[in-house]
């Protein structure tokens, strides 16, 4: 049986994600963000609920991406996730994209010219943001030109880089329905953004989410719930540069902007510049919120849930890969566990996120 990897956030799980799972073949392994996601924000519902959503919709195995893999720019997010999936013996990586290109050929270009491409990237002026530099690199070496408004396509290119020296096939699937950030919906598909904007509309959730009962009943967390804790961190920490990736320039900008910011949106808007994108600023603020500092990615892989087929695959991996199914019995990643404690502050109805929790089992 083919073993297919999918990298996802499921924030929250919707019909487009179900479609992706239906198009994927064989045993489906999901590498999923934990309680904080790539764009630098808390997941709307916790990782256990989202893992159950995925399993009920056809996933076979759901593992958790560590915090410092989940909350990263596209290239680092993709590399970290692919490295973990490779250890679980995936043969192909399936992903949704706005533009179905020949990603295999694109990956070969990077495999052949990686050193030149990275040198070109490093030589671009710092006045450009990292996404702008990446776009310039792909345009120069592969003739690609794309818009920053197509994040799944950008991730597709990041996956092309990540698998360039690995024996993993790329399987792009045309994204269905509304765009990634779209607030509109068509007859069958709505974006995760639109769903997060309509959490108080049961009919909307029922129409566009296959496991709407889980989304409706799960405790929710948003940046507005956690913003007071971020404000406290910024006000009380004597040196913001002690946090992961925060430089002196940004530390000054963040402190100054906080004085006139009542919401996370206002703070991000004031701190962001042409060089420092809003997504990057949200990630930095997330690092400050959870107290993130540079750490090694854990060697163990935390399992959030599995089906019967997933259980059989895990049994074949025992002895080859360090699998963590119960934190407490075995330690895992201290930073991710710290981030989970902060996440729990966002809603008192949330259950303990790590200690004593066992994988969701759907047999």
From Swiss-Prot:
<dbReference type="Pfam" id="PF05636">
    <property type="entry name" value="HIGH_NTase1"/>
</dbReference>
<feature type="binding site">
    <location>
        <position position="152"/>
    </location>
    <ligand>
        <name>ATP</name>
    </ligand>
</feature>
<feature type="binding site">
    <location>
        <position position="175"/>
    </location>
    <ligand>
        <name>ATP</name>
    </ligand>
</feature>
<feature type="binding site">
    <location>
        <position position="96"/>
    </location>
    <ligand>
        <name>ATP</name>
    </ligand>
</feature>
<keyword id="KW-0694">RNA-binding</keyword>
<dbReference type="GO" id="GO:0000049">
    <property type="term" value="F:tRNA binding"/>
</dbReference>
<comment type="similarity">
    <text>Belongs to the TmcAL family.</text>
</comment>
<keyword id="KW-0067">ATP-binding</keyword>
<dbReference type="GO" id="GO:0005737">
    <property type="term" value="C:cytoplasm"/>
</dbReference>
<dbReference type="InterPro" id="IPR008513">
    <property type="entry name" value="tRNA(Met)_cyd_acetate_ligase"/>
</dbReference>
<keyword id="KW-0819">tRNA processing</keyword>
<dbReference type="GO" id="GO:0016879">
    <property type="term" value="F:ligase activity, forming carbon-nitrogen bonds"/>
</dbReference>
<dbReference type="GO" id="GO:0006400">
    <property type="term" value="P:tRNA modification"/>
</dbReference>
<comment type="function">
    <text>Catalyzes the formation of N(4)-acetylcytidine (ac(4)C) at the wobble position of elongator tRNA(Met), using acetate and ATP as substrates. First activates an acetate ion to form acetyladenylate (Ac-AMP) and then transfers the acetyl group to tRNA to form ac(4)C34.</text>
</comment>
<feature type="binding site">
    <location>
        <begin position="7"/>
        <end position="20"/>
    </location>
    <ligand>
        <name>ATP</name>
    </ligand>
</feature>
<keyword id="KW-0547">Nucleotide-binding</keyword>
<keyword id="KW-0436">Ligase</keyword>
<dbReference type="InterPro" id="IPR014729">
    <property type="entry name" value="Rossmann-like_a/b/a_fold"/>
</dbReference>
<protein>
    <recommendedName>
        <fullName>tRNA(Met) cytidine acetate ligase</fullName>
        <ecNumber>6.3.4.-</ecNumber>
    </recommendedName>
</protein>
<dbReference type="GO" id="GO:0005524">
    <property type="term" value="F:ATP binding"/>
</dbReference>
<keyword id="KW-0963">Cytoplasm</keyword>
<keyword id="KW-0820">tRNA-binding</keyword>
